[in-house]
Amino acid sequence: MASQYAAELCALLVEDNFGELFARIFSTLTRYDRLNLPRLKFHSGLSNRQLLPALAAMIQQHLVYHYTSYDDGVTYYEANLQSAYYLVRAGKILEFVEERLGKYAATVMSSIMYLGHAQVSHLENLPELQPEQSHTNGVDKEHDEVDGDEEQPNGLSGDHSDQQPALLHPTLKVLAAHGYIIRVREAQFQSHADNILDAERVLKSRPEIKAMKGKRMEEAVIEGTLELLKERTDGDLTRGLMVQGVPRGAKRKHGSKSADAPNKKARVDFASVDEDDEQDEEENEWSDDEMGYDTTPMESGLVVRVNYNKLDVALRNCRFIQIAEQDASPATAEVYECLLRRIEYQTHQCRDTVEIPREGEEGEQYSVPIALSAVAEDVDPRLDLSGSIGPMEISQPDNRRGKRPLEDDVNGTNHEGANGLSSGGNRTFEVDQHLCLLAQPPHNLTSKRIVSGLITWTVEFRHLARKLRHLELERMIEARYGDVALRVVRVLHAKGKLDEKRLQEISLLPFKDLRQVLASMQAGGFVDLQEVPRDAQRQPSRTIYLWYYDPDRICNSVLQDTYKAMSRCFQRLRFERNRLKEFLEKTERSDVKGNEERYLSEGELALLQQWKAKEALLIGEVARLDEMVAVMRDY
C-alpha cells in the first residue's frame, strides 16, 4: 500500500479526522519512511512540546508504529497506512454493527474506534455509554437489540451502578464473541516486519535452533517465527463466549417464532444429517436468552480495540450475498446468508498472507465446513423455501405384495409441522437444494463436502475473491470501451497470449473493429503487446506480436487510480468547505442548527441545500471507491 497516492490519501484522512498537527507528522513519516525522534523532529519542524504528546496520541490511535532497537536502544517511528485508511471505512463499519447488533452496540464500537483502544473501566465512565433513565423499570430497546431479551427484570433499582454493567458488559461480550473487538497486545504496536525480525532473533538464540544447520535450520526458524508471531499478536476474546460455533447471545432470524412451535427440532432423515440426535438437542437447548442480562462484568483492566480484519470478513460476506441476490431468489440469498454467518464466526481474517497473492499462484482456500443441519436450524422457519425451486417428488414404489404403504399421519408423524410448515426432513432437503443452486456456474458460490458421512457446505474464498476482482474489472472495461472490448478481454483471459489472427478467429470480430478496440485498450493500460522475434535480425516482418491480459498489473494500476480519485474527492470537499467557511460556521451555531428556516434567508437555505447535495455526492463517491479498494486489495 506504500505508494504516492495511498500516502496522500491517508494523510488527507488523518488531517480530516485529527487535525493539521497529526497530518504533518504522518506526512513526514510517509515521506521519509522510518525515523527516530531527532530526525522526525528535524524533518517535521516541530518542537518537543508539540511532537511528544502528538506521537503518544497517534500511537494510541494506531496511526504510528514504534519499535525500540535491541542493538542501540533507539526508538524508531513508522506510519501505519493500513490503520489510517480504515478511517474512511468507519461509517460503513458502524452501520454494519448497528444492523447486526443494535444501536447501543454501534455506540460502544464508535467509542472504542474514537479512542483507538480503551480500557473497560474507562468505557464504564463515558457519558455516551450510560443507560437512559427512562428505561429504568421498563423495556430497554437497546438491550433488546443486543441480547434478544424482551423485558428487563422487574427488580431493577434506579441505581446508576446497577444499570451500567447490565448494559455495557453484555454488549462488550457480544462484540467480543463476534470477534469485532480484540485484546490489545504489545506486538500490535509494531510493524509486521519488526515483529518478524524480533521473532527470528528470539528463535535463533535458542540452543536447539543453534544446534541445527543449513536448510533444516531455515525451515525451523520459518515455522517457529509464524507460531511465535501468532502467539504475540493474538488478541482473540471469543474463548468461553461461543456455544457450538455460535456466539452466545447472537440473534437468530427465527427468534420470534410462535409459542406453539416445538422446543426440540423434529428428527430429520435426509442423508443422516441428524445421526447424533442427542448432540443436536443439546445444541438446540441454548437460546438467544441464555446470555440475556448476564451482568457478570468483564475484567476492568482489559484493553480492547476494533478488529478490522474480522470486520473485513463480514463486509466481504455482504458482497457475496449481493452476488447471490443478483442471480438467485430472495429465499436462496437468505439461505446463503445463514451459511456465511456460520462461516464468519469461525473465520478470523480474509487471507493468511499480508501481501496480495498473484493470479494463479495462490492456492485454493476453503472455509470451515458447516453442517447442513446447522444451516437448516438458522433459516427462518417461516421462509418459503419450496416456492423458488422445483417441486420435490419422491416416488414411493409399491412393495412386493402390491400394497399401498401406510400414510405417515396414520402413525402420528405428519409431514406438516406447526403453522403448515414442512417437516424437518423436507425442509433440510430444500435448504440443500438452495445451496446446490448457489454451487452452479458461473459463480460457484458454495461447495458441497461429505465429512464423516454428513453433508457439509463450504465456501471457496480465494476463488470468489478472484471472481469479485474480475467482475469489477469487466464492469469497468465494458463501461469504458463497450461490450466488444469485454469479449476480447474474456478471450485473452481464457486463452492466454494470442496473436491478432488467432484472436480474430476466436472472438469472431472484423479485423478493423478488433484493431481499434485493442489500440484503445492498450492506450488505457488494460491489454499489453509482446514482441517475439523469429530470428536474431528482429525485423518487424519477422516478428510475432502477441496480445495478452495481465489482471495482476491491471488491478494494481486500478488500485492506484482509485487512491488518486479518493484523494481528489477529499481535496475538492476541503476546497468547497473553505470556500463556504463563514456560511458553514453560521449554520453550525447552536441557535441556528435545527432552526435553519427561522434564521436563514431563502438564498442561504438554497445554498445550504446545494452544499449538502454536493457533500453527499462526494462522500458517496468515496464510499463507492472504497468498495473497489476492498475488492482489489482486502478481500
UniProtKB/Swiss-Prot annotation:
One of its GO terms (molecular function) is single-stranded DNA binding. One of its GO terms (cellular component) is RNA polymerase III complex. Residues 272-292 have a biased composition (Acidic residues). Residues 411-424 have a biased composition (Polar residues). Disulfide bonds: none annotated. Residues 562-583 are annotated as: Leucine-zipper. The keyword Zinc applies. One of its GO terms (biological process) is DNA-templated transcription. It comes from the Eukaryota. InterPro entries: POLR3C_WHD, RNA_pol_III_RPC82-rel_HTH, RNA_pol_III_Rpc82_C, RPC3, WH-like_DNA-bd_sf, WH_DNA-bd_sf. Residues 398-407 have a biased composition (Basic and acidic residues). Keywords: DNA-directed RNA polymerase, Nucleus, Transcription, Zinc. Residues 131-164, 246-295, 386-424 are annotated as: Disordered. It is found in: Nucleus. Its main location: nucleus. Pfam families: HTH_9 (PF08221), POLR3C_WHD (PF22536), RNA_pol_Rpc82 (PF05645). Belongs to the RNA polymerase beta chain family. DNA-dependent RNA polymerase catalyzes the transcription of DNA into RNA using the four ribonucleoside triphosphates as substrates. Specific core component of RNA polymerase III which synthesizes small RNAs, such as 5S rRNA and tRNAs. Component of the RNA polymerase III (Pol III) complex consisting of 17 subunits. This is DNA-directed RNA polymerase III subunit rpc3. The gene is rpc82.
